[in-house]
Amino acid sequence: MKVILLEELEGRGSFGDIITVKDGFANNYLIPRKLALPATEGNIKHIQSILSQKARKLEKIRTQAQELAKKLDGAEITIKKPVGQNGKLFGAITTSDIAKALNEKGFNVDKKQIIISSPIKNLGLYTIKVRLHNDIYASIKVNVEEQK
């Protein structure tokens, strides 16, 4: 029996794939658990329309990420924190602090998109990467200054 997968099945396929399985497997397992639909013409057209909508949506998100990357690339933000002796910060600057500073400048960036290897604990200028999409990155400069 031919079925259209509604979820990824390990070793079988992913969403929208049309696969051939035994009738019992389809009728007793895949279809009742809503993991697949019978591969009728109507179902195939329905899944194709869903796939095309997803593709358009992903392309729109990708385009928005590219536009944001152009605006964000090379941007510089300044974060002021209290400092102890030897230029060490009280606490550290984390992705949350950087995201907050970027949002204040008008860039809509989530803290999960900011990539730093470890929290910033010293004064200085740092180059930080921001992951906006699967393969779209922007570099920003974070200037850490003493709060007076």
Swiss-Prot record:
Molecular function as annotated in GO: rRNA binding; structural constituent of ribosome
UniProt keywords, alphabetically: Ribonucleoprotein, Ribosomal protein, RNA-binding, rRNA-binding
Keyword Protein biosynthesis among record annotations: no
GO biological process assignments: translation
One GO cellular component, as annotated: ribonucleoprotein complex
Record Pfam families: Ribosomal_L9_C, Ribosomal_L9_N
SUPFAM superfamilies for this protein: L9 N-domain-like (SSF55658), Ribosomal protein L9 C-domain (SSF55653)
Purpose: Binds to the 23S rRNA.
Membership in a protein family: Belongs to the bacterial ribosomal protein bL9 family.
Name used for this protein in its record: Large ribosomal subunit protein bL9
Upper classification of the organism: Bacteria, Pseudomonadati, Aquificota, Aquificia, Aquificales
